[in-house]
Amino acid sequence: MENNNGNNQLPPKGNEQLKSFWSKEMEGNLDFKNHDLPITRIKKIMKYDPDVTMIASEAPILLSKACEMFIMDLTMRSWLHAQESKRVTLQKSNVDAAVAQTVIFDFLLDDDIEVKRESVAAAADPVAMPPIDDGELPPGMVIGTPVCCSLGIHQPQPQMQAWPGAWTSVSGEEEEARGKKGGDDGN
């Protein structure tokens, strides 16, 4: 469970706590009778997949244990960040910091945030387009139309169609009635 980012390492105390937690978990026996997470709920979630026809009796128990271990590990890493900030309450920022600093939790990062960060960085440092002398574009580029595989095969843009009734006009009488009933007048 080493952090490969290098810039924000956990304190040695935290690494020791995590190591002792994982060594105890690896040595411990799987208790088939006591569960912290509801097994029937896990079975329901597993059955949402249309490809699942039968579930072995051990599968929900193992998945429950894996989820418990995942939650405990993330909580411990978040708790270490809360202690670094001299707080005794976990906050979302602690969980975010634990996720950001741990490579194995990269799947929890929000792709939309990453895309926004990339677009902001691109806008801050625009790359100039090289001048085109002959009026020709580089291979694979056609203005306004995507090109498939740089072969010059143009893909038509899908046409947007409005749903019937999606854009309805309001008659003058209805507008007046809305105004008399206390409408917001577009504010």
From Swiss-Prot:
The entry's function note states: Stimulates the transcription of various genes by recognizing and binding to a CCAAT motif in promoters.
Major subcellular site: nucleus
Compositional bias per record (Basic and acidic residues), positions renumbered to this chain: 177-187
The family classification in the record reads: Belongs to the NFYC/HAP5 subunit family.
Can you say what this protein is called? Nuclear transcription factor Y subunit C-8
Start and end residues of each stretch annotated as Disordered: 163-187
Q: Which InterPro entries match?
A: CBFA_NFYB_domain, Histone-fold, Transcr_DNA_Rep_Reg
Record keywords, A-Z: Activator, DNA-binding, Nucleus, Transcription, Transcription regulation
Organism of origin is: Arabidopsis thaliana (Mouse-ear cress)
Pfam families attached here? CBFD_NFYB_HMF
Q: How does it assemble?
A: Heterotrimeric transcription factor composed of three components, NF-YA, NF-YB and NF-YC. NF-YB and NF-YC must interact and dimerize for NF-YA association and DNA binding.
- What molecular functions are annotated in GO for this chain? DNA binding; DNA-binding transcription factor activity; protein heterodimerization activity
Which body tissues produce this protein?
Expressed in flowers and siliques.
GO cellular component assignments: nucleus
- Which superkingdom, per the lineage? Eukaryota
Q: Where in the cell is it found?
A: Nucleus
PANTHER family per the record? HISTONE-LIKE TRANSCRIPTION FACTOR CCAAT-RELATED (PTHR10252), NUCLEAR TRANSCRIPTION FACTOR Y SUBUNIT C-1-RELATED (PTHR10252:SF133)
